[in-house]
Design a protein with these regions (language model features):
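Non-heme iron-sulfur electron-transfer modules
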Residues: 1-9
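Conserved mixed alpha/beta catalytic, RNA-binding, or beta-rich assembly cores of soluble enzyme
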Residues: 12, 18-27, 35-319
Length: 319
């Protein structure tokens, strides 16, 4: 009875461990959002080797800091199309795993999923592929490997029933794939699942959500970027895209950082003296306030100057 209405789920390991869910409010101003939306780039067995290699080379290029936070595509979504063999899928999973990012295995064939998990289960990926027709077998595969299971349904009723059935099997280490047939259905699904969990206290829907934009806006990169912004604000725990370039990343990660900043606490750095460029007690002193954005802008310029100095941060209450 004291557990939060939305379960907190951890995926990945080490530095790449990601925390999803755990939200308690529908709107940021009511308290705060807890765990930020994570972005995934999709690979598919339907792609040729050259396309896969090009995407794998592009993913690490978007990796930068903004106000002390690392901005990069945290997840690689590896999709298994209907024509793929186990060998082909496993080979693609191994290629993706070499990046060192957290993986989501988009696979609804229990045998292929089992083979893929043999090469990556230690990195704690998500196995996204349980549905009304295969949930028992997929649950067994995910449970044996000790990984999070992704659940989907043709509509919310089927998603609810399948999730409830998996819970009865003893597995509550789940994420819900709320992707529908189109943008409208996907948005409605994602919002209704979150409202049911937080407003109606329905714990069957109290799990993080996956929204796959590659399915509902495939090939339209501009639309995917816009939808990623929408689902960042409206309840996508993981948003899957076909690519992540700087053009998409700069506005998207800036938006995410603002949405998932605690409105009760100003973004601030610790007041104090920060030597820069080898500054000592005889060096120039520069002072500014403790608002985080001001600090990172000022400190960046000072570092680039190469002048030894001490940056003194005053306590201005984060303003």
């Amino acid at each position: 009875a004291t557990a939060p209405p939305m379960k907190t789920i951890k995926i990945g390991t080490g530095d790449e461990e990601l925390t999803l869910g755990g939200e308690t409010v529908l709107f940021r101003h009511e308290k705060t959002f807890v765990n930020k939306t994570r972005y995934a780039v999709e690979l598919c067995t339907c792609m040729d080797d050259a396309t896969v290699d090009a995407k794998l080379a592009e993913i690490p290029k978007v990796d930068y800091d903004r106000i002390g936070e690392r901005m990069y595509a945290e997840i690689v979504y590896v999709n298994c199309d209907a024509e793929a063999t186990a060998d082909k899928y496993v080979a693609l999973v191994q290629k993706a795993a070499a990046l060192g990012r957290t993986l989501i295995l988009g696979c609804s064939d229990p045998e292929i999923a089992k083979a893929a998990l043999e090469v990556c289960k230690d990195s704690k990926p998500v196995l996204n592929g349980a549905n009304a027709s295969n949930y028992e077998a997929m649950n067994a595969v995910a449970t044996a490997a000790g990984v999070v299971l992704g659940v989907s349904g043709k509509d919310l009723n089927e998603l609810y029933d399948t999730t409830a059935a998996i819970e009865k099997l003893g597995n509550k280490n789940l994420v819900l794939d709320t992707t529908g047939a189109d943008v409208k259905e996907t948005f409605a699904n994602t919002v209704q699942v979150r409202r049911a969990a937080l407003k109606d206290q329905d714990r069957t829907f109290g799990y993080p959500s996956i929204v796959n934009l590659a399915k509902i806006a495939g090939g339209d990169y501009h639309l995917q970027a816009g939808l990623a912004a929408m689902f960042t604000m409206k309840y996508g725990s993981i948003v899957v895209m076909e690519r992540m370039t700087y053009a998409e990343a700069l506005p998207l990660y800036g938006l995410r950082q603002n949405v998932f900043t605690d409105p009760q606490k100003p973004m601030r750095v610790e007041p104090g003296i920060y030597p820069m460029n080898g500054g000592d007690e005889n060096s120039l002193v520069v002072t500014t306030v403790d608002f985080a954005l001001t600090y990172f802008l000022v400190s960046g310029e000072l570092e680039r100057s190469g002048v030894p100095l001490n940056l003194v941060i005053n306590d201005a209450g984060g303003l």
